[in-house]
């Protein structure tokens, strides 16, 4: 953060606009209710949450920071209500028809950030579900990186930015759980990228 007051004002105004954009149930999406949880909806919601959460880190105003976190939590809660395990919920890797769900699975990072800030177990539980889901409907990218047997060009999903984004979330998951396997998985992937 540069400490530039004009930049802070722009970020603050943007955070306020995002907070105001939330629907009554907390949803912030460019997709209609009929088409949500498809296409790039989850990817866009990820960045709604990350934008708000990154702003919380630099916010000078306690009340605004609390509202930004609350808004990010409510957005996450709309996802938790519709996506996951259980009757009537959509599998995370099925919330997009492209790239086998890796873009959707990358919500792991903001979900973990919310968990780190709140300590609310439901977010860690949802993150555990994402990790168990493997990040993709055609390959468990986390397990494959842990086993370290495949070169990246042999992965079934070759969407580099989204895969890296999933692993950023996996590292946050490791930070919360201490499960060494996931740290090793991320290190293996990083080594393969070099």
Report residues per predicted region:
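Glycan-recognition and catalytic cores of secretory/periplasmic carbohydrate-active enzymes
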Residues: 1-194
């Amino acid at each position: 953060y540069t400490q530039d007051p004009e930049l802070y004002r722009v970020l603050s105004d943007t955070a306020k606009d995002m907070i105001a954009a939330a629907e009554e149930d907390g949803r912030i999406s460019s997709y209609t209710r009929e088409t949500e949880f498809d296409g790039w909806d989850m990817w866009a919601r990820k960045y709604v949450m990350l934008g708000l959460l990154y702003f919380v880190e630099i916010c000078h105003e306690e009340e605004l920071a609390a509202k930004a976190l609350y808004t990010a939590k409510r957005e996450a809660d709309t996802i938790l209500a519709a996506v996951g395990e259980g009757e009537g919920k959509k599998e995370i890797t099925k919330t997009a028809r492209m790239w086998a769900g890796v873009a959707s699975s990358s919500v792991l990072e903001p979900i973990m950030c919310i968990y780190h800030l709140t300590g609310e177990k439901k977010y860690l539980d949802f993150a555990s579900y994402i990790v168990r889901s493997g990040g993709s409907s055609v390959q468990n990218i986390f397990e494959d990186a842990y086993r370290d047997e495949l070169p990246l060009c042999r992965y079934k999903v070759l969407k580099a930015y989204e895969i890296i984004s999933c692993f950023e979330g996996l590292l946050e998951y490791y930070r919360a759980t201490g499960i060494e396997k996931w740290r090793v998985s991320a290190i293996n992937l990083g080594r393969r990228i070099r």
